[in-house]
Structures are given as structure tokens and as C-alpha cells.
């Protein structure tokens, strides 16, 4: 570059690489001919870059540049990251290290986090939040401090008149927050002085100031170029100004719009430059969400006019068409200027090579993006970059690419909490926090890394036995209920007790953590448990190494600060901390595919760039106000508004749009429902106008849908299985007859196929569990009355609940209502003239060669000698109408068994049939419990027809199904109130809508 080659000069040397040129490649293309000629050439050059990722991107650009020209070796420039806390050492001889000795070290971020939590607790006193909430507040406080420190705002600035004048107009909570923040900051500064340390942001500022003074006094003998640095922090802006004025220095900016009209440039707002001394540097109307705003802010703080910035004329290998930059400029016009779209000429809105793809779901979007990547790789040498801030979408794309053995690493990484090693430690913390709750416990023991020193298959075999036993309502906390479950199943599984000893040895320390103990000690217990389960595999991969660094640092820091936690908060605290740690993949992915986050995508370029996840709340992310300082306070202090980051996201998209080929994609729905298109995507669509159809990508969507769409198939018929006579030869229970007649398929699935529904782990206690428990209590109470007629039912209820390992919360909610209902039953039984003959009585009979059996909850002897059959219900009993319709035949079948002498302990004719409900009742003295009979009611069967009708229905079931050949058709009677247990098995949703009325009848 001729301009860059000049020595000296009266003005700053600032350049801009247009979006369509590709920053890193264009930068290298311009630097190489200027600096490689004499001596060590490029090795004499120092590049100041914004991030470690940018350093890697530029290094790759150098390698591509020389590789394309067949040159084997090169000495690359020294590259220093401006945010490096050891910038003085990175610059080496260019910056006298001795001169930086007076700059204190930076405080460790984790130590600052825990120390701020302690200060907040002391400042807030009784109002201080507890546990994880306090630590979250400390993290937010640290972020706000960093935001102010980057702007060189010190605690004393919070007490200046420009801020104090605003306090009276603020809401009460903002006032309290400001006072607390100011006090904590002041105490924190005092603490740092005692430690002879500074915040990381302060150290960076001091290093920038030191370098600025050193180079302003004596410029380095070798060239220094700041490339891609766009941070507008005042100290860094001053350093960049100094670099631009050095004889061999220059500043190169990405994507500064030099063609923008001055009127539009002015419409962006003040951007840090107050029109008068007392005015705020940021106005309410500033277009902080514009992609050029942060660059205007930087130029203003550097003291460089936009007219002084020169265009960089070199271009990279993956440069886009020049007219693309004009379209990008028009695309992001501020609100007033966007009226010009109506009169824009074609060359100003030309977006050739840009396509828009709108999928239905994130899954379809990921599949379509993977197909676009796969297609692009068919062309030799073509590079593809997928840019998205949605890490879940990125993981889906990575998984889909594995279909073709394309290994694409997500360079943005994953949070440590979402990796295998991190998740294992978190699950151990959840077990400690929840007292070995079944969901957390089974998840921990089933973790892919867990084996407990055994063969993994043997480990899982025993675990499945325990997991099946834990299905149902949550037991009470602790290991004792689990040990009782293991003991109860030891006879059927001899290896289970030995396996449980291993597990118990791991879990016992987790559940023995003190109520309020040291965080360091708790982490040590968690690590020991995780190692006992996973062994060395816990630390073997990159996530394990990251976890090792994390736990060691947190443990040491927590011990130094004396941080204490409750076990119940342990998992929340660790998850919050691990979410801040990114685990990036090692090298080894496909050389021509990259998946970036927004930060990682800066300065990178590819032949095809796919911008995915373009929905509001994703790209751009939702703008959130500072939780501690009110927006007017931040404006008065000279801090950009909350939407500033939206402008950075817009700049990232503008940079990506400069690629030769660009695909912008979104999903119409996400996991929560309909999604709103990104404001950036809506601008692209509006700019294209009538040309939008020409820029729509549909091929990839068609391919993606073709991969998931199955070939058309015939409508699934209504199931009507016809088992053999041998398979049909099953008994009929009293509760199954109505299912056999109303929905034969359910009977077939349950009695012939022997399929039973599995309860979920920690399932909410439902009617089935409540019924079993209530029946067990009543059975024991009746049995106790045989020896003690005055036996109380409450102690029996307590004992049954203890044996059932019922969770304390469940007991607290249900026991009072249950006890009231049970007391009603006890009172009714004591006051009755009946004699209780049998409880939970099993009976059976042979009916036309088929065994019919049932269990009567209670059988009473009536004063006249007949029998009363009682059925307990925890909820509302079947109505007389349902009984008459044949939808509730249990009492009738039990009556037939009793009539034929099927109950050995209760001979006699059945005369009464009753439901005793434990549900709420206004007529009960206790508020719960009532009895009713379906027989003899106006809408129910008469006493004379009840048993004969039941017998006829039983004979029909035996004749047609058990002894006959009638198919077990699904939903034979559509009015039958069937359970949904087997709906999926019968594929109900596939055939029910098309079932014709004749078939129904």
C-alpha cells in the first residue's frame, strides 16, 4: 500500500477495509508486499489484534496467502492481543517491561466474584439474598463495574453532581441500588489497595496508557499496525490514536462505511461527543443499534474525522462483489434516512449472491444448513462458514454433518455445564442438594461416564432394577428409603445388595454435607464422588481438563475467601459458575468448514457464509438494561445505552454479508412457539422488495424435507387383533369385564400381551397410588379391629406412609384430607349394625369354563343375613348411568362370585352394592367421605336386573372373546370412557379421524 508505506505524515494513518473485501485476507494481501522485502520482513511487524480468535484468523490468512502462491515457509508478524493482561510482555522490546513494573497485577476474576458476594452480604445485611441469588448479584455487580472501568469511570464519579441531580427522579429501587453499588465499589477499591492489585479492566487501561505514553515519547523502530480493533474504550482509543500517528504505525478498521452521506452519519447521534461541555455525550435519540455507531464512537474518541480515514484497496481471496458494500450501507440506514429506499437505484440495492431461507422449525433449519454445507464442499477448495449466536442450533448442525462424516467444530465452544464431565459433577451436586431424589440419582448413575469401577454392562443391569423400583411417587429424602427398596428386591436380584454398597459408599459423603459448610470442602466431596463413579475418564478429554482447572481454581479461591454454602444451593451455584466457562474443541475438524459464534466470526471470511438463527432474541439478542444502574445514570456517566450490543450484532451481520455467497436463514417456530424474524432480516426483505422471490432459497429446504418425509403409506386400519384360541384362554378379572366389552383392544394388550404401563420416576401421586395406599390403611385397620374393636386409624395411616417412603411434602398435603376421610369410614363402620366378614377378600368362580376372579374391598353381613359388597373409591365413584350402560361392572361381577359362593369367608346372597368414597362431602361430619349405591336408583339398574344383566354381559364376553373368535377391536364402544394407556400402541390418532360411522356403530 502506497499510503501505508509513507513515513511520518501530518495526520493519523487510519484505514477501512470494506465488508465485501474480506478483512483478514485483504489485510494480509496488503501487508505482505509492504513488509516482506528486506531482512526479516514480516517478522519485524507487530500487529495489535482484538482477540485470541482474531490472532488465529489472521495467522490462517497468512498461511492461505503463502500456500496459494506455493511458498513453503514464512516468518509471521508478532501478534499481540490488546486485551491481554500481560500486554507489556507480549510486546516485548517494543514496550519497556521495566516501565510497566509499577502496574499492579490483576485480581483473579473468581476471587473477585466471591469477595464481592461477601461485601454485598455485609452491605445489605438482613436484606441480602442467600446462596446462589447472592452470588448472581455479585456477578452482575462485577459486570457493571467492568462496564464502568472500561470507560475509566471511578467510584467518585458516582457522587458527582451530574449523577446526584438525577437521584431524586429515580424510582426507589434504583436509588437503593445506586447507593449499595457505590458503597460496595468503594469498599472493593480499598480491598484491592490492601492486596496491591487492580481489576482486570483497570490493568488493561493502565497498560494502554503506559504504551501510549511510551510510544508518544519514542516511537518503536519497527512498524506497529492495529488491525480490527473496534473497542471504543477511552484508554484504547487514545492508544490507537498514538499508533496511527507513529511514523511506522497504522490503524485498520473493519467495515467503516466511507460512502455514507454526512447527513446520515450525523443522524447516528452524538456517539460520545457532547455538543457542549455540560451536555451528555450520549443522547436518548442516538442510533446505538446501528452497525456504524460503535465505529463513530471510536473515531470520536480517537479524534479522527471520518474524512481522514482512507479506503484499503487490497482485497482477499474470498471477496464479494463491490456493489455489495453499497447495498449493506443502504440496508442499515437509520430511520429517517431509510425513506430513501423508495428512490434507491438498482446498484444500491443489489444483493446478488444473497439468499433467504425460512424453515418451519430449528431442526429443519439445521438439516437444511447442513445440506448447504455438504453441497458446497463438493467444490474443491470452497470454504464454508456457519455463523450463529444460537449454540443449540450450532450443535444440531454439527450433528447433522456427521451423517456424511464431516467433523465441524463449533469454535464458540460449549458451556462447561453442558459437557459430559461438567454434567457429571452437576448431577452429583443435584443429588447432594435434593437428598438423593430419584430423578437426579438415576441421572447421575446412568451418566455415560459412570461405571463405579465395574463393567459398564453389569453396572447398568443393577441400576435398571433400582430404576424400576423408583418409578412412582418420590420417596422421602436420604439413603435409608433407598436401602429398604434394595433389601426388598434382594431375593430376586442377588447381585443388587453388593452393587448398592458401591453406590452407597459414593453417595454417603454427598448426603453428609453440613447444613452450612465451606464451598471448598463441598467441591472436594463432589470431585471425590465423581472420580469414584467415572475414574480417570472424568479428566481424559478437553471438557475434563477444563473441569479440572475450574474446580481447582474455585476450590482454592473459596478456601481463601471462606465462602460457605448450603447443600441445597450447591447445584445452582456450580451451574451458574460453569455456564461462564467455555470449552472449545481441539483442532481436528474439517479444514474447509467452520461454525462460529458472533465473536468468533469477526474478521473471518469464507466463500459461502450461512447466517443462521436470524430471529429476534437470538440475532440480535434481547437488549437488557443494566440491573444495578438506571439508564439515566449511565447516560450521565457517559456509558452507551443497553442497545449498544445490538449495533455490534448488526455490524457482525454486515461483515458476513460481504462474502461472495450468503444465506440468511431462520425458523418460523422455536421451542416456545412462533418466532419473530430478526429486525435485520426484515430490513433485507424490505430492501429487496419485489426482488425477494429471486433471493429465496428453497432447494435445501426441499432436500431437508425429503430426508425426513416417509413414502406415502396406506392409512393405518383400526386395530382388530385375532389371537389364537390358546392365546385367548385367559382369566377375566372383575375390573376387566367392562374393558373387554367397551374397548377389547385394551383387554388384549393388558391380559393377552401382558403389557403394563410404567410409571415415571418421581411421578406425581395419582389416583392409582392414592387408592393403593388408602386400601392398605383400611385393610390393616379392619384387621386390627379383630383383636381391638376400638383401634385407632391414625397411627395405622402413619405407619403405612412410613413404609411407603412417602415424601414429607406429599404427606403434608394429602394426609390431613386422607385422615378426615378415614375417620369418616371408621365412624360409619363403628356405628353400623353390620358385621364386617372379610376385607380385601379374594374370590373366584368358573363361568362357562373360564376363571372369573376379583377382590372385594369389604364384605359385610347385613342384619337380615345377606351380604353387602363395598368398594372403596378415593375419588368420585361411577354414576348409576355408567353402571347401567355397562361401563362399571366390577360390583356386579363381585356379586356374581358371591352368589356362587366364590368368597370362602363370606357365604350368603349378595343384597347390597355400595361405593364408599373418600372424596369431599358436605354431608360428612369430617368434610370427607360419603356412600352411595348404583342399584335401585332412577338412572341406574334395578335390584332385580342388576346381577342378571351383569351375567349376560359376562357371558357375552366369554362367548365372543375368550371362547370365541371375535377380534379384539379398538374402541368397540366409542362411548366407553377408556384410559389412554394404550392409545399409542393402537395408533389411535392415525385411524380415529377417518373412522366411518358404520364402523363406530
Residue map of PLM features:
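Polyanion-engaging groove/track-forming segments
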Residues: 1-788, 798, 803-804, 811, ...
Amino acid at each position: 500500500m502506497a499510503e501505508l508505506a509513507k513515513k511520518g505524515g501530518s495526520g493519523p494513518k487510519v484505514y477501512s477495509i470494506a465488508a465485501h473485501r474480506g478483512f483478514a485476507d485483504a489485510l494480509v494481501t496488503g501487508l505482505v508486499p509492504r513488509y516482506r522485502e528486506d531482512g526479516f520482513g514480516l517478522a519485524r511487524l507487530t500487529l495489535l489484534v482484538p482477540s485470541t480468535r482474531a490472532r488465529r484468523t489472521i495467522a490462517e490468512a497468512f498461511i492461505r496467502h503463502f500456500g496459494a502462491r506455493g511458498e513453503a515457509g514464512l516468518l509471521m508478524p508478532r501478534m499481540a492481543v490488546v486485551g491481554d493482561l500481560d500486554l507489556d510482555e507480549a510486546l516485548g522490546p517494543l514496550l519497556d517491561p521495566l516501565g510497566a513494573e509499577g502496574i499492579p497485577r490483576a485480581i483473579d476474576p473468581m476471587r473477585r466474584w466471591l469477595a464481592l458476594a461477601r461485601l454485598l452480604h455485609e452491605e445489605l445485611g438482613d436484606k441480602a439474598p442467600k446462596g446462589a441469588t447472592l452470588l448472581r448479584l455479585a456477578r452482575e455487580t462485577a459486570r457493571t463495574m467492568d462496564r464502568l472501568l472500561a470507560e475509566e469511570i471511578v467510584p467518585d464519579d458516582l457522587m458527582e453532581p451530574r449523577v446526584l441531580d438525577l437521584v431524586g427522579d429515580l424510582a426507589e429501587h434504583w436509588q437503593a441500588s445506586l447507593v449499595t453499588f457505590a458503597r460496595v465499589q468503594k469498599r472493593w477499591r480499598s480491598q484491592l489497595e490492601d492486596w496491591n492489585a487492580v481489576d482486570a479492566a483497570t490493568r488493561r487501561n493502565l497498560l494502554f496508557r503506559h504504551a501510549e505514553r511510551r510510544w508518544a515519547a519514542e516511537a518503536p523502530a519497527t512498524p506497529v499496525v492495529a488491525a480490527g480493533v473496534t473497542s471504543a474504550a477511552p484508554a484504547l482509543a487514545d492508544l490507537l490514536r498514538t499508533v496511527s500517528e507513529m511514523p511506522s504505525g497504522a490503524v485498520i478498521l473493519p467495515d467503516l462505511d466511507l460512502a455514507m452521506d454526512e447527513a446520515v452519519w450525523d443522524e447516528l447521534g452524538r456517539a460520545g461527543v457532547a455538543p457542549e461541555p455540560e451536555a451528555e455525550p450520549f443522547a436518548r435519540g442516538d442510533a446505538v443499534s446501528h452497525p456504524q455507531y460503535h465505529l463513530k464512537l471510536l473515531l470520536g474518541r480517537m479524534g479522527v474525522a471520518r474524512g481522514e480515514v482512507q479506503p484499503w484497496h487490497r482485497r482477499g481471496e474470498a471477496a464479494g462483489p463491490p456493489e455489495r458494500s453499497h447495498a449493506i450501507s443502504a440496508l442499515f440506514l437509520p430511520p429517517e434516512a431509510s425513506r430513501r429506499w423508495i428512490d434507491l437505484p438498482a446498484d444500491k440495492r443489489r444483493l446478488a449472491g444473497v439468499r433467504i431461507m425460512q424453515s418451519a422449525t430449528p431442526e429443519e433449519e439445521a438439516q437444511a444448513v447442513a445440506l448447504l454445507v455438504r453441497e458446497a464442499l463438493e467444490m474443491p477448495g470452497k470454504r464454508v462458514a456457519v455463523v450463529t449466536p444460537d449454540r443449540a442450533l450450532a450443535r444440531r448442525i454439527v450433528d447433522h454433518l456427521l451423517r456424511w462424516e464431516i467433523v465441524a467444530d463449533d469454535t464458540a465452544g460449549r458451556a462447561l455445564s453442558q459437557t459430559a464431565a461438567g454434567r457429571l459433577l452437576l448431577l452429583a451436586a443435584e443429588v447432594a442438594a435434593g437428598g438423593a431424589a430419584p430423578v437426579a440419582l438415576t441421572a447421575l448413575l446412568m451418566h455415560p461416564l459412570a461405571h463405579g469401577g465395574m463393567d459398564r454392562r453389569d453396572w447398568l443391569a443393577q441400576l435398571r432394577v433400582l430404576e424400576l423400583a423408583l418409578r412412582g411417587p418420590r420417596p422421602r429424602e436420604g439413603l435409608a428409603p433407598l436401602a429398604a427398596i434394595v433389601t426388598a428386591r434382594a431375593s430376586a436380584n442377588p447381585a443388587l445388595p453388593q452393587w448398592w454398597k458401591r453406590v452407597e459408599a459414593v453417595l454417603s459423603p454427598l448426603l453428609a454435607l453440613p447444613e452450612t459448610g465451606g464451598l471448598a470442602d463441598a467441591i472436594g466431596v463432589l470431585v471425590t464422588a465423581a472420580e469414584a463413579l467415572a475414574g480417570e475418564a472424568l479428566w481424559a478429554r478437553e471438557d475434563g481438563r477444563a473441569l479440572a482447572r475450574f474446580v481447582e481454581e474455585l476450590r482454592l479461591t473459596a478456601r481463601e475467601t471462606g465462602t460457605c454454602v448450603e447443600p441445597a444451593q450447591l447445584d445452582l451455584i456450580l451451574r451458574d459458575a460453569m455456564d461462564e466457562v467455555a470449552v472449545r474443541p481441539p483442532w481436528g475438524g474439517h479444514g474447509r468448514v467452520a461454525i462460529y459464534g458472533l465473536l468468533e466470526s469477526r474478521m473471518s471470511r469464507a466463500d459461502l457464509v450461512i447466517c443462521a438463527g436470524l430471529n429476534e432474541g437470538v440475532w440480535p439478542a434481547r437488549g437488557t438494561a443494566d440491573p444495578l444502574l438506571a439508564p439515566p445514570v449511565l447516560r450521565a456517566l457517559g456509558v452507551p445505552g443497553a442497545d449498544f450490543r445490538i449495533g455490534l450484532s448488526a455490524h457482525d451481520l454486515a461483515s458476513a454479508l460481504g462474502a461472495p455467497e450468503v444465506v440468511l436463514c431462520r425458523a418460523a417456530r422455536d421451542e416456545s412457539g412462533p418466532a419473530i424474524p430478526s429486525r435485520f432480516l426484515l430490513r433485507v426483505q424490505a430492501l429487496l422488495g419485489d426482488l425477494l422471490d429471486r433471493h429465496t432459497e428453497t432447494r435445501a429446504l426441499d432436500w431437508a424435507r425429503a430426508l425426513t418425509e416417509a413414502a406415502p403409506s396406506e392409512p393405518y386400519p383400526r386395530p382388530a387383533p385375532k389371537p389364537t384360541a390358546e392365546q385367548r384362554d385367559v382369566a377375566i378379572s372383575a375390573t376387566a369385564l367392562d374393558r373387554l366389552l367397551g374397548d377389547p383392544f385394551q383387554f388384549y394388550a393388558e391380559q393377552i400381551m401382558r403389557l403394563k404401563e410404567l410409571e415415571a420416576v418421581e411421578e406425581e401421586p395419582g389416583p392409582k397410588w392414592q387408592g393403593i395406599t388408602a386400601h392398605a390403611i383400611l385393610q390393616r385397620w379392619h384387621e386390627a379391629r379383630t383383636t381391638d374393636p376400638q383401634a385407632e386409624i391414625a397411627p395405622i395411616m402413619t405407619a403405612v406412609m412410613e413404609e411407603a417412603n412417602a415424601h414429607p411434602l406429599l404427606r403434608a398435603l394429602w394426609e390431613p384430607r386422607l385422615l378426615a376421610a378415614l375417620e369418616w369410614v371408621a365412624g360409619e363402620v363403628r356405628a353400623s349394625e353390620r358385621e364386617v366378614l372379610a376385607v380385601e377378600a379374594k374370590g373366584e368362580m368358573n363361568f362357562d369354563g373360564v376363571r372369573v376372579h376379583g377382590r372385594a374391598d369389604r364384605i359385610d353381613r347385613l342384619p337380615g343375613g345377606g351380604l353387602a359388597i363395598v368398594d372403596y373409591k378415593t375419588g368420585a365413584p361411577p354414576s348409576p348411568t355408567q353402571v347401567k350402560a355397562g361401563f362399571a361392572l366390577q360390583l356386579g361381577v363381585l356379586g356374581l362370585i358371591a352368589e356362587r359362593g366364590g368368597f370362602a369367608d363370606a357365604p350368603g346372597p349378595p343384597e347390597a352394592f355400595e361405593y364408599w368414597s373418600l372424596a369431599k362431602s358436605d354431608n360428612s361430619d369430617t368434610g370427607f367421605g360419603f356412600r352411595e349405591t348404583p342399584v335401585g336408583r332412577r338412572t341406574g339398574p334395578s335390584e332385580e336386573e342388576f346381577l342378571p344383566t351383569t351375567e349376560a354381559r359376562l357371558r357375552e364376553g366369554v362367548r365372543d372373546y375368550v371362547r370365541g373368535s371375535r377380534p379384539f377391536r379398538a374402541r368397540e364402544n366409542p362411548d366407553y370412557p377408556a384410559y389412554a394407556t394404550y392409545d399409542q400402541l393402537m395408533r389411535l390418532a392415525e385411524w380415529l379421524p377417518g373412522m366411518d360411522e358404520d364402523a363406530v356403530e
